């Protein structure tokens, strides 16, 4: 171990910063967050420091450094570009046994700053002892993704309740089990939802009676396919799940992010055949949640856009099961972005409409006259099977036959397929398309050749998420 990790309490302790530039301003911001009394020595100070000085939040002690300035400080930071001055500060600090950090000169540091993940009062510090800053940054990125923002509030409430829990449960084993149950159960869910009053009520109820463990259902949008597009909240839910029920549309890369010992069950749905009836899926969700499991329902895209997520939550509500929703990037946004097709554009499309292509077999359930209006973009989910009927109806109601169209299959993935053409060619294009696929109809489709940027090479070699690399 090259450095001893310490967490220093510098609240109301004097800290000297020599230097007044941008680097010094960054160090001051960190010290200020930790509650230090900050003294600055510099000829001139950065505008951010000027504001702090005018507000009496820092003290501009002097314009030049002298060793005596170290006599009454806890630690010193040298943030200048003057190597001789930095050497002088380092030697003076060492002689007085003051902790010193010379920015970007590790040989003149008795301490170094770690990379920080801040969920106060939970704080994680990472360091490679200066050997690999990029690796530390990647590790921090992974931890930032895995640790929910609510973690700090959870710790704060837990600290408030510690004396009461200790009085009620004197045995350390009982207290450990109590907190494990709380941090993995309804209490954590309430804190994450921002319902702090209810979270404390849950702790009180858990303490006063031996409640059976209560599970919950988390509806998670997996996004359009690229695992890098999964939200941080979605990743956290997958890492906490006991059971995950997922659809065919969820990519293997996203499934790889599920906690290793979680049970994974495919309840896949595809146009034309349903492997598991919706009622059976609802029943399973409720049954496992009632057994105290944390059940994740993982859906491609966004669960509230043609995902039947509302139906599943209605069933959970009726069964009095706690639930939460983690939205995802819907297929329309992901497919269009990766294809280089802006869904709206000031010159071509003033609105965008999302519809499903198989809700009514005869097509009579849709207002084709409205859908056929010019200067709007239609995004059609599950429309490949009825592509001929769709193009016929739109042309019949006034949409021009030469309106650009695109069919995008396997959107955002290395095997993404894009078929471009005209509205009157939609049926023939659909016969060539792989599935699942999305239809985009509108003048914006004509921009695809100019704005296309994504390729399988781009995905594999340039933009692969470091979260996946470190998984």
UniProtKB/Swiss-Prot annotation:
S-adenosyl-L-methionine binds at residues 224, 300-302, 305, 330-331, 382, 411. Its EC number is 2.1.1.107, 1.3.1.76, 4.99.1.4. Pathway: Cofactor biosynthesis; adenosylcobalamin biosynthesis; precorrin-2 from uroporphyrinogen III: step 1/1; Cofactor biosynthesis; adenosylcobalamin biosynthesis; sirohydrochlorin from precorrin-2: step 1/1; Porphyrin-containing compound metabolism; siroheme biosynthesis; precorrin-2 from uroporphyrinogen III: step 1/1; Porphyrin-containing compound metabolism; siroheme biosynthesis; siroheme from sirohydrochlorin: step 1/1. Gene3D superfamilies: Cobalt-precorrin-4 Transmethylase, Domain 1, Methyltransferase, Cobalt-precorrin-4 Transmethylase, Domain 2, NAD(P)-binding Rossmann-like Domain, Sirohaem synthase, dimerisation domain, Siroheme synthase, domain 2. SUPFAM superfamilies: NAD(P)-binding Rossmann-fold domains (SSF51735), Siroheme synthase middle domains-like (SSF75615), Tetrapyrrole methylase (SSF53790). NAD(+) binds at residues 22-23, 43-44. The modification Phosphoserine is found at residue 128. Residues 1-203 are annotated as: Precorrin-2 dehydrogenase /sirohydrochlorin ferrochelatase. GO terms for biological process: cobalamin biosynthetic process; methylation; siroheme biosynthetic process. Then it catalyzes the NAD-dependent ring dehydrogenation of precorrin-2 to yield sirohydrochlorin. Finally, it catalyzes the ferrochelation of sirohydrochlorin to yield siroheme. PANTHER family: SIROHEME SYNTHASE (PTHR45790:SF1), SIROHEME SYNTHASE-RELATED (PTHR45790). This is Siroheme synthase. It comes from Zymomonas mobilis subsp. mobilis (strain ATCC 31821 / ZM4 / CP4).
